[in-house]
């Protein structure tokens, strides 16, 4: 039969506008097309792998059979444009803008303070928008499932969820208790309200209602196209790949016969990742998305037949419908599948990933295939030779040649049988986090019994995540004929232990944990089946203790809720004075509409080149040769830049721009390729040939560095009292060590820079995503060998920084500047997520050793602490980090005799750098560990020991700085009260007595955080305020808007000082021409010091205006300004703040370093699953001393965001390195920050009743970093839960649990009969897959 006619015309719509592309390139994805071809830059690049949600768009299609339009969210970075024929794409620009009208979703997420840096906001908006197009009144479960595929690094998610919940029918109150009554309605906060405490950050009444009738209509032309669609074969030929999309099954089968090795693609969620990250290319790609037979659903008495082309979301909806109509005993397999479909990947992936693709890919971590395998499912396949049914069994999943599809065969559908009465099916998975994460281990298990007995007639167990393929526990077949009892369970556990074999060096690591999970899942299955058998035949089966059965309940996907309280402004404060009020972020609406411009959103200039770098693949090696000839000959390549092209300084203090002669870490930049597109530059980097010769030593870990005495800088030391003498008088002495892993900044906007040569006098404009524009300017000037006055750095906004954009942008901008100077053309240098994580380094991993002397009542007499941090291969800010860790290590505790020492270890890893908290989260964690250990040794409650050792009266820190701890005690006591600590601790104890396999823990921690830098010049700031003759005001200052709301606060300051409404005032960009010689924006001082500068400039201007105002007191602002101009009075003023007096003398070990302290306390409660290591954050209460907040909405947002980032540091985020120093975790696919389901179910934040802080503007305090350490309250709550489990099992107490407390750490700490079944791995026999670097 002849094939249908070909067409090369691609037709789709974007935001209601028709797009026609002839011979579209199959390798071009929708994200690139939107951003670079049609200049819709609201959709952001965050990771390129569909894991972060930044590029979320809505895709709509019309089904000519059902006559319905479907809307679904998708990750644009994975959607090939060739797959969009007949589709309508809606981006954030298409639903609303400041030029037309903003959509209710955009309005609510902005006014609800759900945006900080704003980079993730368009993706969040589009996820919620798509949900509302399908469900105008969504349920809380739908909201949580929708947002599970979107990441945010700034907000802590609470305000985003709250904005989405405002569309839900039950959004009028917070579900604070089991009665679903609002805490405010019950009068719980009456005392605070009497004291003018406010709990409203915005006015819901101002929100415009959602009107579904006002949405963009689906293009009628596409409906006609779908109805009249000829059976043409769409064929698009690109540079390397041809995309063929047949319209009939016959054409599809013929194409598969002609191109048997061509992959079939519908969702591109697997193939797309291979093409992008593994550089796999396919000459031919076949898309069967138009074949109707692949989307058929048939429901019979035997089971369901599901078309292979159905998306996983469609499969979930179909199964949910069937499960709601049929008895549970008939839908066991369906329920098991649904359990995993709720959390598999993110919503954007489930919406496009096909059932057939998921099955055929046979990924070892597939969540569905083990269930299909045990469920006796069948694959219906077809070829030109006819149809065939293939069992979806362990042979198929293992890739046995005789059991899989032939190259010319196509999977048409999957038959999923109904379960039988005495058949039980269960599914299990454990992932790094609850949503949007591949399973570490998963399983499908099925057992059948002889009717009305517990005698096994069939047993099937399949595991994912155990080997290179799905693994079948075949030996368990020997159990057929046995009774379902404990003896059978013991034998099954031993069989699985023998069958599940993982080598020490198995990819993915966690060998003991994965083996333990396999056995733990079996036990859960045993209990689950026993429970169901008991229900059906109560007399035959033994009673099961409820204490054991609680573990069968998975942690629910619940929507977080909570309260935020702060001091309201004085009733006498003028309405136009917005200081102290919860004002929306200045760019909030622009964030939500996608109109906020980030570095890579700027239009490409004529002749602009794109830069891609070649990085070292060796940790320590000599460069023998570098051959770039093949790269230079590649299409589009203009030049290759190396160290020889640097006209000035190639780096200082060992931090080279380009490696020369030697490389000192994996990820060090060796050379760069400049080409006319990024894709061509990237492809050319793979053609650069470098020959290395390994060098010794190779130092990766802290232990390596100690062995080789490899350090950066001298040892730092502080001491007070007589430590040795105090040890002699102590009742007990405790020694130990604790390890804290590193942390990736994971700012949503990767490192970005554009360098534009101006053509004369060596001048350059640099647009950079940087926290320190002046340092970038200085480094570029030094690199090029020119004065700084030729370089102007521009920073409009930064998509998150957290310290990671302090020093690194200077290096990357210099790399780009050399390329720009050499080629004479503009250069765009935007790091991909993987390169960003590989090159830039993060938070310093730490080893802490301690020796503590204490009395039996818990009073600590002496402590001797040694800290070692992994600094990486160059100094960067590491010496400052270790200094800060030592200075702040004591936290809230008065230890009369204390010695602290610290060293920076020099290793062959990328240099670690500044990160939010700057050493405090590490140092205070070590202290929290040994204080808790003291409590355990004394058999005292941890909170009693913490309270006993806290500062109580005016005193001096270890560096001899005086401070008043009054507000520290207030925070502690208020947090105790707000959290109902003692009553909840009693409830936790009662829960633990009644549950064996699940345990709860509660912990409360105090915090003393010192704000600022150790030198006065670090605190200086400048501002320029200009008043125009129409009365409008332009403010410029030296701070950078990172999402922390500094620009919003500066407008509030100027508004108060000039006594004009905020609407009169505008901030444009920060640049080094307007405000020179700036200091990095960090250390929680940005608003403090720049606010003083803005205040100074405004006061100068008001002083000039005083005579005019006094002459015309009844005039208005515009009249006064016009008169000032007529009188030739300058309406421009530079403000300056010299900085806080600060200095530290390390020889004497003393100094008044910090202008003030921020105090706080946090109480967190968690529940852990002792069998899997999973945990649920139940509730957190935070009390923070913010003094008089300039903007409570911004400050509470900073507290929440920092807390969740800290929660990630201490419990989730894990950087994994090979023994050779290669970073494995190079994106959200492998590295898991907290998602929306990881934050506390109840999340309460209170700002302490204000007290005076004369050091900062308007008596405010900088709160950007302090909340980070409070995340450790979750860690210590987990440790308490683990302690409860170990105590019940009669195990010795673990005095120090290493951080992060991941699922692996938690599970392996809860030792039991199952962990004891697993033999310990011997790392001496072979290298492990990954190693801890602390």
From Swiss-Prot:
Q: What EC number is given for this enzyme? A: 1.2.3.1, 1.17.3.-
Domain FAD-binding PCMH-type: from-to ranges: 236-421
Question: In Gene Ontology terms, what is a biological process of this protein?
Answer: xenobiotic metabolic process
Which residues catalyse the reaction?
1265 (proton acceptor)
Positions of the 2Fe-2S ferredoxin-type domain: 8-95
Query: One Pfam family of this protein, by short name?
Result: Fer2
Q: How does the cofactor bind to this protein, according to its record?
A: Binds 2 [2Fe-2S] clusters per subunit. Binds 1 FAD per subunit.
Where FAD binds, per the record, is at 264-271, 354, 358, 367, 411
List of residues that carry Phosphoserine: 320
Instruction: List the InterPro entries.
Output: 2Fe-2S-bd, 2Fe-2S-bd_dom_sf, 2Fe-2S_ferredoxin-like_sf, 2Fe-2S_ferredoxin-type, 2Fe2S_fd_BS, Ald_Oxase/Xan_DH_a/b, Ald_Oxase/Xan_DH_a/b_sf, Ald_Oxase/xanthine_DH-like
Q: Say which domain of life the source belongs to.
A: Eukaryota
**Compartments, as annotated in UniProt:** Cytoplasm
Catalysed reaction(s)? Answer: an aldehyde + O2 + H2O = a carboxylate + H2O2 + H(+)
Enzyme class, one word? Answer: oxidoreductase
Q: Name one GO molecular function term.
A: 2 iron, 2 sulfur cluster binding
Keywords linked to the UniProt accession: 2Fe-2S, Cytoplasm, FAD, Flavoprotein, Iron, Iron-sulfur, Metal-binding, Molybdenum, Oxidoreductase, Phosphoprotein
Residues the entry annotates as binding [2Fe-2S] cluster 2:
117, 120, 152, 154
Signal sequence range: none
**Extra facts:** AOX genes evolved from a xanthine oxidoreductase ancestral precursor via a series of gene duplication and suppression/deletion events. Different animal species contain a different complement of AOX genes encoding an equivalent number of AOX isoenzymes. In mammals, the two extremes are represented by certain rodents such as mice and rats, which are endowed with 4 AOX genes, and by humans, whose genome is characterized by a single active gene.
The entry sums up its family as follows: Belongs to the xanthine dehydrogenase family.
Quaternary structure, from the entry: Homodimer.
Q: What does this protein do?
A: Oxidase with broad substrate specificity, oxidizing aromatic azaheterocycles, such as N1-methylnicotinamide and phthalazine, as well as aldehydes, such as benzaldehyde, retinal and pyridoxal. Plays a key role in the metabolism of xenobiotics and drugs containing aromatic azaheterocyclic substituents. Is probably involved in the regulation of reactive oxygen species homeostasis. Is a prominent source of superoxide generation via the one-electron reduction of molecular oxygen.
- NCBIfam families linked to this entry: mam_aldehyde_ox
What this protein is called in its record is: Aldehyde oxidase 3
């Amino acid at each position: 039969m002849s094939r249908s006619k070909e067409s090369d015309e691609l037709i789709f719509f974007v935001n209601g506008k028709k797009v026609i592309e002839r011979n579209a390139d199959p390798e071009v994805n929708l994200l690139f097309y939107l951003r670079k071809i049609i200049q819709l830059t609201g959709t952001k690049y965050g990771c390129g792998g569909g894991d972060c949600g930044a590029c979320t768009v809505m895709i709509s299609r019309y089904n000519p059979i059902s006559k319905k339009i479907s809307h679904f969210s998708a990750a644009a970075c994975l959607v090939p444009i060739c797959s969009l024929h007949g589709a309508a794409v809606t981006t954030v620009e298409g639903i609303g803008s400041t030029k037309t009208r903003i959509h209710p979703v955009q309005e609510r997420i902005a006014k609800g303070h759900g945006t900080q840096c704003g980079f993730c906001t368009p993706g969040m908006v589009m996820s919620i928008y798509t949900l509302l197009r399908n469900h105008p009144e969504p349920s809380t479960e739908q909201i949580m499932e929708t947002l599970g595929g979107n990441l945010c690094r700034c907000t802590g998610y609470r305000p985003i969820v709250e904005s989405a919940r405002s569309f839900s029918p039950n959004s009028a109150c917070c579900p604070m208790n089991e009665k679903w009554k609002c805490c405010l309605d019950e009068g719980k906060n009456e005392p605070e309200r009497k004291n003018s405490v406010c709990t409203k950050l915005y006015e819901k009444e101002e929100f415009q209602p959602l009107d579904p009738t006002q949405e963009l209509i689906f293009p009628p032309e596409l409906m006609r196209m779908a109805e009249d669609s000829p059976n043409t074969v769409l064929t698009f030929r690109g540079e390397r790949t041809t995309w063929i999309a047949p319209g009939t099954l016959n054409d599809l089968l013929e194409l598969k016969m002609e191109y048997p090795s061509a992959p079939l693609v519908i969702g591109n969620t697997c193939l797309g990742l291979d093409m992008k990250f593994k550089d796999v290319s396919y000459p031919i790609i076949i898309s069967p998305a138009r074949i109707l037979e692949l989307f058929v659903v048939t429901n019979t008495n035997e089971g369901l037949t599901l078309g292979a082309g159905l998306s996983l979301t469609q499969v979930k909806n179909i199964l949910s419908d069937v499960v709601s109509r049929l008895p549970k005993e008939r839908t066991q397999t369906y329920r098991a599948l649904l359990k995993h479909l709720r959390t598999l990947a993110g919503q954007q992936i489930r919406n496009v990933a096909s059932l057939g693709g998921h099955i055929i890919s046979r990924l070892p971590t597939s969540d569905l295939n083990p269930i299909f395998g045990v469920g006796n499912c069948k694959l219906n396949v077809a070829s030109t030779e006819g149809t065939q049914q293939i069992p979806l069994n362990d042979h198929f999943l293992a890739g046995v040649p005789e059991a899989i599809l032939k190259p010319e065969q196509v999977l048409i559908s999957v038959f999923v049988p109904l379960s039988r009465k005495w058949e039980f099916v269960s599914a299990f998975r454990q992932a790094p986090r609850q949503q949007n994460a591949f399973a570490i281990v998963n399983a499908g298990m099925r057992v059948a019994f002889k009717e009305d007995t517990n005698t096994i007639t069939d047993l099937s167990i399949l595991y994912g995540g155990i080997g290179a393929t799905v693994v079948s526990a075949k030996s368990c077949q020997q159990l057929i004929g046995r009774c379902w009892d404990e003896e059978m369970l013991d034998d099954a556990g031993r069989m699985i232990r023998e069958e599940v074999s993982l080598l020490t060096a198995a990819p993915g690591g966690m060998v003991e944990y994965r083996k333990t999970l396999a056995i733990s899942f079996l036990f859960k299955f045993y209990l689950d089946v026993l429970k169901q058998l008991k229900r059906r035949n109560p007399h035959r089966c033994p009673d099961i203790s409820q204490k054991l059965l609680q573990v069968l309940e998975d942690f629910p996907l619940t929507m977080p809720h909570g309260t935020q309280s702060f001091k309201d402004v004085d009733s006498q404060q003028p309405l136009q004075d917005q200081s102290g009020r919860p004002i929306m972020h200045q760019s909030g609406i622009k964030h939500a509409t996608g109109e906020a411009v980030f570095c890579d959103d700027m239009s490409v200039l004529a002749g602009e080149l794109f830069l891609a770098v070649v990085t070292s693949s060796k940790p320590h090696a000599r460069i023998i040769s570098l051959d770039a000839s093949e790269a230079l000959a590649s299409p589009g390549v203009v030049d290759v830049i190396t160290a020889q092209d640097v006209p000035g300084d190639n780096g200082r203090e060992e931090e080279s721009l380009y490696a020369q002669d030697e490389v000192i870490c994996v990820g060090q930049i060796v050379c760069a390729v400049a080409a006319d597109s990024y894709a061509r530059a990237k492809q050319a980097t793979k053609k650069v040939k470098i020959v290395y010769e390994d060098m010794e030593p190779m130092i990766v870990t802290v232990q390596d560095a100690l062995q080789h005495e490899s350090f950066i800088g001298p040892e730092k030391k502080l001491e007070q009292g007589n430590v040795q003498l105090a040890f002699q008088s102590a009742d007990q002495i405790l020694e130990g060590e604790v390890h804290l892993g590193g942390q990736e900044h994971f700012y949503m906007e990767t490192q970005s820079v554009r360098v534009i040569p101006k053509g004369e006098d060596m001048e350059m404009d640099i647009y950079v995503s940087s926290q320190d524009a002046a340092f970038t300017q200085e480094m570029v000037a030094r690199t090029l060998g020119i004065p700084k006055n030729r370089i102007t750095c521009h920073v409009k906004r930064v998509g998150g920084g957290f310290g990671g954009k302090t020093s690194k942008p200077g290096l990357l901008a210099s790399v780009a500047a050399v390329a720009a100077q050499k080629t004479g053309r503009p250069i765009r240098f935007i790091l991909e997520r993987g390169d960003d994580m590989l090159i830039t380094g993060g938070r310093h991993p730490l080893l802490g050793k301690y020796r503590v002397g204490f009395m039996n009542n818990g009073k600590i007499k002496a402590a001797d602490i040694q800290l070692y941090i992994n600094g990486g291969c160059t100094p960067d800010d590491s010496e400052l980090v270790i200094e800060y860790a030592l200075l702040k290590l004591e936290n809230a505790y008065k230890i009369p005799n204390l010695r602290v020492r610290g060293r920076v270890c020099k290793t062959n890893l990328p240099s670690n750098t500044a990160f939010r908290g700057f050493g405090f989260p590490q140092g205070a964690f070590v202290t929290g560990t040994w204080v808790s250990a003291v409590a355990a040794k004394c058999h005292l409650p941890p909170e009693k020991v913490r309270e006993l050792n806290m500062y109580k009266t005016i005193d001096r820190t270890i560096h001899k700085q005086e401070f008043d701890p009054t507000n520290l005690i207030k925070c502690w006591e208020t947090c105790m009260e707000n959290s109902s600590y003692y009553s909840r601790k009693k409830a936790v104890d009662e829960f633990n007595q009644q549950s064996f396999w699940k345990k709860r823990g509660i912990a409360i921690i105090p915090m003393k955080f010192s704000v600022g830098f150790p030198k006065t010049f670090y605190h200086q700031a400048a501002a320029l305020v200009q008043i125009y003759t129409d009365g409008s005001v332009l403010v410029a200052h030296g701070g950078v808007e990172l999402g922390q709301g500094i620009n919003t606060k500066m407008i509030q300051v100027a508004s108060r000082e000039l006594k004009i409404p905020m609407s009169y005032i505008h901030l444009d960009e920060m640049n080094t021409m307007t405000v020179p010689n700036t200091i990095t924006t960090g250390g929680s001082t940005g608003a403090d010091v720049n606010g003083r500068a803005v205040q100074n400039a405004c006061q100068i201007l008001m002083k000039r205006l005083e005579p005019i105002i006094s002459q015309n007191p009844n005039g208005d602002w515009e009249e006064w300004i016009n008169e000032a101009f007529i009188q030739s009075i300058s309406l421009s003023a530079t403000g300056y703040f010299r900085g806080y007096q600060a200095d530290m003398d390390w020889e004497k070990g003393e100094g008044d370093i910090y202008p003030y302290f921020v105090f706080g306390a946090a109480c967190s409660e968690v529940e852990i699953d002792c069998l899997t290591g999973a945990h649920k954050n139940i509730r957190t209460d935070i009390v923070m001393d913010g003094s008089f907040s300039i903007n409570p909405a911004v400050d509470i947002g900073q507290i929440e965001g920092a807390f969740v980032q800290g929660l990630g540091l201490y419990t989730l985020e894990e950087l994994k390195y090979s023994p050779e120093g290669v970073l494995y975790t190079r994106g959200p696919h492998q590295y898991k920050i907290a998602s929306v389901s990881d934050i506390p179910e109840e999340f309460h934040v209170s700002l302490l009743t204000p007290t005076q802080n004369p050091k900062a503007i308007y008596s405010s305090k900088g709160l950007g970093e302090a909340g980070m350490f409070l995340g450790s309250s979750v860690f210590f709550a987990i440790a308490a839960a683990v302690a409860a489990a170990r105590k019940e099992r009669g195990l010795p107490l673990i005095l120090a649990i290493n951080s992060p407390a991941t699922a692996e750490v938690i599970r392996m700490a809860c030792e039991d009969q199952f962990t004891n079944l697993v033999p310990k791995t011997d790392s001496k026999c072979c290298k492990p897959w990954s190693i801890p670097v602390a």
